[in-house]
Amino acid sequence: MSRKSIAEKQVAKPDPIYRNRLVNMLVNRILKNGKKSLAYRILYKAMKNIKQKTKKNPLFVLRQAVRKVTPNVTVKARRIDGSTYQVPLEIKSTQGKALAIRWLLGASRKRSGQNMAFKLSYELIDAARDNGIAIRKKEETHKMAEANRAFAHFR
């Protein structure tokens, strides 16, 4: 058995304007090549756009979008006796939230549009309204897990 101590999970720090951890998690996923100020600028423009379009608190829309995209289960490929099975697994809320953020950003990058701030804002608005590419991804994952429920005992 290892004598090394287990590293403690780091808690995400809140961002300077909204004082919210979720916003900071999103900024860290937008981040490319260490350009954090650009990532903040993209997100804050997206939040401003959300406020103009929906006339609601952008933080509320963001939370709602992440909550609706967060998956409960996921599938993991397990190789047993030479054949690969997609085994459904329940995931923790933190991991689900991280997946939701990743899916939202992936979906907004795929969107056609002017710039990342607009694409992100429209994807967040769509996700909060229960449609959009990220919501489809979640439903697809849940369907996959449901279809492979027979392999759940291979955990």
Swiss-Prot record:
GO BP, sorted A to Z: translation
InterPro entries: Ribosomal_uS7 (IPR000235), Ribosomal_uS7_bac/org-type (IPR005717), Ribosomal_uS7_CS (IPR020606), Ribosomal_uS7_dom (IPR023798), Ribosomal_uS7_dom_sf (IPR036823)
CDD domains for the chain: uS7_Chloroplast
GO cellular component terms given for this protein: chloroplast; small ribosomal subunit
Major place of residence: plastid
Coiled coil segments of this chain: none
Single GO term (MF): rRNA binding
Compartments, record wording: Plastid, Chloroplast
One matching Pfam family: Ribosomal_S7
PROSITE patterns: RIBOSOMAL_S7
Keyword field: Chloroplast, Plastid, Ribonucleoprotein, Ribosomal protein, RNA-binding, rRNA-binding
Entry-linked HAMAP family: Ribosomal_uS7_B
Function: One of the primary rRNA binding proteins, it binds directly to 16S rRNA where it nucleates assembly of the head domain of the 30S subunit.
Subunit structure of this chain's protein: Part of the 30S ribosomal subunit.
Stated family: Belongs to the universal ribosomal protein uS7 family.
Name of the protein described by the UniProt record: Small ribosomal subunit protein uS7c
Annotated organism of origin: Marchantia polymorpha
